[in-house]
Amino acid sequence: MYNNVVESLVRIYQLAGYTTLRFNFRSVGSSEGEYDSGMGEQEDVKAALHYLTQRGKKVLDLAGYSFGSWVNALAISEVDTVDRMVMISPPVAFMDFNSVGLTPQIQLVVAGNQDQIAPVELIKNLLPTWNPRAHLEVIDGADHFYVGYTGKLESVLTAYLKDHGA
């Protein structure tokens, strides 16, 4: 939750006027629980969405980086409160995305062309099964960690939110 990519996501969404909520999945950082191969982590996402809707948030967007994008993509099929989703470097070379079916909420996927965990070609192959109208933004030179490329990532997110604002 405290890395350059998540910090950029939070900053850009807040600057665009969004209320943001970020959390560590179970067993990460100071969070309780044990890693649950994505199953329990989906429950974490659903609990966070429930928390927000109980506080009057009606329009919800999800944005996830790496493992978080995978868990979000799996969890979103079981909720009806999410309007849009952004995936940053979905780890398609590392996690099984085959069970992510048609998900119209997926609007934007961002990956670096040097990312070996989220290879652009694999994402291009999977994207039509997730949402054929989703946009893939490739950041030249960026790897999975976006060191030296967070400014470009923030520009991509800012443009997306300007076009798809709250």
Q: Model-predicted segments: where are they?
A:
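Short beta-strand/loop motif that positions the catalytic acidic residue
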Residues: T103-A111, D115
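Alpha/beta-hydrolase active-site loop signature
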Residues: F25-G29, V92, D143
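Acidic catalytic loop of the alpha/beta-hydrolase fold
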Residues: N113-A118, H144-F145
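Catalytic histidine-centered segment of alpha/beta-hydrolase-like enzymes
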Residues: A142-E154
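Primarily recognizes the serine-hydrolase "nucleophile elbow" in alpha/beta-hydrolase
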Residues: V45-Q105
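Serine-hydrolase catalytic machinery in alpha/beta-hydrolase-like enzymes
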Residues: M1-R55
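Short alpha-helix in the alpha/beta-hydrolase fold that links the catalytic acid
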Residues: P119-L127, G151
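Catalytic histidine neighborhood in serine/cysteine hydrolases
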Residues: T129-F145
